[in-house]
Amino acid sequence: MHTIDPNAQIKLVAVDMDGTFLDGNGQIPDEAWGVIDQLQARGIKFVPASGRQFVTLREQFAALGEIAIIAENGTVVMDGEEEIYSNVIDPAAVKTVIEAVREHQDLDAGLVICGRRTAYVERNDEKFMQAVAPYYRAVKFVEDLSEVQGDIIKMAVNVGTGQVQDMADALEVPLQVVVSGTHWVDAMNHGVHKGLALGALQKELGITDDQTVVFGDYPNDLEMIKAATYSFAMANAHPEVAAAANFTAPANTEHGVLQVLRAYLEGRSQL
């Protein structure tokens, strides 16, 4: 396991959520709030970076007031209520994904299409909505997703156990398709990812890679991992992420992010 150089002039800490910052029960550890308070007291920005919806992340971190958030796998970046960056999918591509998912009900597929503040679904059975709820708190049921008006920035498909790669392969669409979890496949414009979003935020704030710490565990974190000098893969990370990161943090079940940050705040070179 590794630590951050105690002499590093860190200005930004970006954390993936599931499998990284959240504990084994998918919750924010109680002791996290004290660590974040210490970061903020030093002028260090704490930035959740997730496939989750902006509204969901804002509610989860409401105790911190207005903070910067990278949401929807990097398709939107907010600093408080100010939009720093977003990337909108062509409506024709949205309809292509809707049709593709409808054709693959053998994979128990359910689609969420994501606007900046609201997500939309045309399937509302209990099983699917339970899967959607942790990630999309502002969600609206519609009879036909193809009738939704307004900008769409990401689409997320929920599938059954062991079927994410089958779904990803089945989405023959003019978009970037990313496996973002054990039951989730995301589709967004090519070249859009958490790394691009982090870069936009760094530029806006005048923060360099050397002043940035990133924690991640899954392939949708890869580009973000590459955008920071202090890039940490969790001990439970996917092999691709472990290979790309410069350092390793203890597993999320051991509150690894907090261990590394606490060591830095206390000026320790060992966990």
PLM region spans:
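Mg2+-dependent phosphoryl-transfer enzymes with acidic/Ser/Thr/Gly-rich catalytic loops
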Residues: 2-12, 28-29, 188-271
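Residue-level signal for inorganic ion chemistry
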Residues: 19, 39, 50, 73, ...
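Conserved acidic, metal-coordinating active-site core of Asp-based
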Residues: 104-215, 219-227
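Active-site phosphate-binding/coordination module
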Residues: 24-128
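Short hydrophobic/aromatic-enriched beta-strand-loop microsegments
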Residues: 66-73, 87, 132-133, 177-180, ...
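Short active-site oxyanion
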Residues: 41-47, 65-67, 153-155, 210-212, ...
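Asp-based phosphoryl-transfer active-site loop
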Residues: 9-25
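Short, structured coil segments at secondary-structure junctions
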Residues: 63-65, 73, 170-174, 227-228, ...
